[in-house]
Each structure stands twice: as structure tokens, then as C-alpha cells.
């Protein structure tokens, strides 16, 4: 029996466990864990960002981004079926004290005309719209991929309208590898988070990416919500191993198509 409930039910391979056992560790609260430091720098460079922050989950990464990009009372534009709005236990209203505004979309890809209409409707009786959050791949649309060129267009729009763009990229490596697209997301969004424990196969962990200033502030927010960790290189080593073997996702895609076709 193959368990296909979720890509989160995977267990570490023997090779991954060996990396965990032999990981070099230190106190990450003091930025002294070499494995974490290496992972953060490597991942940031890989996706074109200035810096990264290792966090326990994608939810934590998303919520720290909102804490960074918004002020209490702001609105964040996203899709009505997004993970950040529907599947994070109301964390955005609890932590950031913001609300969401929804726009039309096709498979997670925002309708720019509707987005523009919503932005231009804003006036002093309405909440300030500060951030746009998209999800790539889009879970509620069956894991659909937002074309990279559409993210570029969206970022041009958000930048010209003084809005921040956050990408919930929990499974973004599916999109990057499947379409063999550019991975320089750092040029086309203000922040991005992705999970090592989804698809990539690590047991724990996600990473939040952005500018150095953004990540410095995010480190403080992580501490405030109890996300600071100590000898976390033990799990960061598994994340690095998973990321170095990301090409295996293409085999997963072939197997998924075979199951679907049969």
C-alpha cells in the first residue's frame, strides 16, 4: 500500500539519516550553527535573494512575512482558496491583525484587471492594502503552476503601486523543475517561503527568503512567536540533503502521471 494522502508523510532515507547523525551544529540563536548558516546562504543564492531564515514550518514563514509587510488593520490581497487565508488557523488575524481581500484568479494566477480594480477602489474609508500574496504551486487548484512570466508581470504591478509581493512557495520546486524555468525569484518578489518537508522529503523545516533587512527583522519576529531554535543543524542537514537531491521530484512527476494514466 502506497500512502498518497500527502507529500508530508515521507520518512527520511538512510542517506538522509546519515547526514543528520554527522551534522555539525551550534547555537542558532547566536547564529553559530554552521549547518544552518550554510543552508540559509546556499538557498538564498539559489533563488536570487540576499538572505534566508530557517523556520519550523511554511505557516511560520508566511506569517512572519505578513508581520513584516503589514501594519494592523491592513488588507492583504490573495485568492479566496489560498492556504495563507484558509489553512493557517486564522494566524494572520491573530498575529498581524490584518484581513484579506480576494480577487478573481485562474488556477492561482491573479486577474490583473480585477486586482487593479480592487486597488483603485481604495480610499480613506477602507483598509489600506499593503501586500499581495500568491501561492505557487496552487494547492486548491490541484497543484497548478503559475507561469514565471506572470509572476514577473505581477511584481511589476505591485512595485509600481507600492505593494509588497509575497510568494507562498511551499511546493515551488515542482514549478521550477517541471517547467525548467528560471529560479531567480528574488528579482520578482519581496519575500518567498518554501517547505523542505513537502515534496523535497525532509522531515521538518521551511525557509523564508528576502532582503538582508527583511530577514533581520524576520529573525526578531521568529523569536517573538517562539520560533528560535538551538542546535537546529540536525534538521537543517536533512533539509540541505533534500534540496541537493531536488531533481528527484521529476521522477515523482513521472510516477504521478503513470498512476493517473492507469
Mark where each language-model region is.
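Conserved PLP-enzyme active-site core in the AAT-like
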Residues: 3-262
